[in-house]
UniProtKB/Swiss-Prot annotation:
Example of a GO cellular component annotation carried by this entry: light-harvesting complex
InterPro entries named among the record's database cross-references: Peridinin-chlorophyll-bd_prot, Peridinin-chlorophyll-bd_sf
Organism: Alexandrium cohorticula
Gene Ontology molecular function terms on file: chlorophyll binding
Entry PTM: Binds 12 peridinin and 2 chlorophyll a molecules per monomer.
General function of this protein: Water-soluble antenna for capture of solar energy in the blue-green range. Peridinin is an asymmetric carotenoid.
Subcellular location, principal: plastid
Keywords: Chlorophyll, Chloroplast, Chromophore, Light-harvesting polypeptide, Plastid
Protein name: Peridinin-chlorophyll a-binding protein
Subcellular location: Plastid, Chloroplast
Superkingdom, taxonomy of origin: Eukaryota
SUPFAM superfamilies reported for this sequence: Peridinin-chlorophyll protein
Length: 49
């Protein structure tokens, strides 16, 4: 089905990146702080352009 095909494509494309993430890094244990949607969108737009 289309969803399964898309999921496989996404998994294949992201696997190399996901392997490089150190899940034992202490940063993942820290609280993210106050979420600011506008600031998040600015950061995403800055990296996407």
């Amino acid at each position: 089905d289309e969803i399964g095909d898309a999921a496989k494509k996404l998994g294949d494309a992201s696997y190399a990146f996901a392997k490089e993430v150190d899940c034992n890094n202490g940063i993942f244990l820290q609280a993210p702080g106050k979420f600011q949607p506008l600031e998040a969108l600015k950061x995403i737009x800055k990296h996407x352009v």
